[in-house]
Amino acid sequence: MVVEGVLNPGAFQFEGKTWLVLRIAERPAQGAERVSFPVLNASDQVQIMEFKWDDPDLDLSDPRYVRYKDMTYLSTMSHLRLMCSEDGIHFHEPEDRPSIIHGKGNLETFGIEDCRVTCMEEDYYLTFTEVSRNGVGVGLMHTRDWIRLEHEGMIFPPHNKDCALFPERINGKYYSLHRPSGVDLGGNFIWISESNDLKYWGRHQCIMHTRPDKWDSARIGAGGSPIRTEEGWLEIYHGADHNHRYCLGAVLFDLEDPSRVIARSDDPIMEPEMDYEKNGFFGNVVFTNGHVVHGDKLTLYYGASDELVCAATFSMDAILDTLKKTYCRPD
């Protein structure tokens, strides 16, 4: 298998170090006559599927997918890999903990992706995307020591992804942001839900829409866990336009009622500018689902062009100052 991308890491602090849960996207080396891609079979073993490049029923117009007749597959299969760092820049595999998390079962036959990590009540909760021919949903795992992971299964069924947990209970309830995908009606909007136990979710509300003619006109989705500030819950989210250009923005939710949007970025706080952000496996993409906070310093770990992992630092106060210029509501 060939690694096509290392991208979209979850991030957290543990035992005095910065840790990332990387997404590793792989596929077989491509031959001259056939396109090939991996899936998991019923025994959780990797099986290689192939189609001839010149097959008229084959659609490879989007490098992320292999479409054949009435079926859609992923061109790569992803697993998760744990890395740690003493300085937040230079990362290595941990020596005393398992570092690889593979997909398994019939809900993860196309892999697992884009993990978000939330530390809450001494435990670490991992929400991640489960992909299979059954659709795209959200899975949940948790751990306290990063040695044993407890799998809770799928908590949001297809089609859903981009699930970020709030890092504490609010009025006795757990809250999560997530992104159901509208097919014919609705759209790729951000929703909020609440739960008593993190496994079963209800009181679903749509709280953020895409905005016509803006940088986030086609789809939006949550980044890492919301960050508590004096002004409200600060969330860094991604938005894309109809040309599939992904940027990052900020939104502020009410501390006591996180379904209420206080403010939202008019303009991106980050957009593809560097060559490695504009060109790659799937270019013009900056995408975050993990960060760490030290005082006013916010370090975003993000995927560039679905191929690389990068880091960028921001002032929390500076982001909040830009939001003070706006007042918004779901539109």
Feature annotation, model-predicted:
Residues 1-110, 118-218, 227-281, 295-298, ...:
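Beta-rich carbohydrate-recognition and catalytic domains
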Residues 113, 163, 224, 287-289:
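Structural signature of WD-repeat beta-propeller blades
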Residues 276-278, 286-290:
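Short glycine-rich, acidic/polar surface loops and turns
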